[in-house]
């Protein structure tokens, strides 16, 4: 992800603003312009997450924002937990919870097991201009919700960016959807 700072503009800045607002840090209107209110929200987020409060969104800040950006949280199984209870407390379906945690046995949850809890919001944020970085975040978010998806490199573009593919299953029939755009 690109490094953002006071004065940055564009879809990644808008995504940052929407994410900060969603998790309780008032970045103001999500207009794609990194102004004073966004700067203050970034400082507050950094302080809350033991990151040096520079107001610059650099890799350490992006890493701390990853669960909110990608739409998941982690939950450690406690005594008395069931998948139904965990799903209900997080306002998601048991199906979504089991899809994100293949191999977890619903009838015998082990205390201390760390589960991925997907959020109920859409992976795609429809009111942000689509760009390469957002496409990559969307692929990562899908992989978290559906670990069976295989993300792979199909090569590099003329602009030297990775061209990603996603395999959703295996079988006798192969279907290719091309979503390239310039």
Regions from the language model: what does each represent?
Residues 18-29, 33-52, 78-111:
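LysM (lysin motif) carbohydrate-binding repeats in extracellular/periplasmic proteins that recognize
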Residues 69-80, 84-106, 110-182:
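M14 metallocarboxypeptidase catalytic domain recognition
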Residues 1-32, 68, 75-78:
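Acidic, Ser/Thr/Pro/Gly-enriched interdomain connector segments
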Residues 53-69:
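Alpha-helical interaction/regulatory segments in DNA maintenance proteins
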Residues 35, 58, 160:
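Short, conserved phosphate/pyrophosphate- and ester-handling motifs at nucleotide-, phospho-/glycolipid
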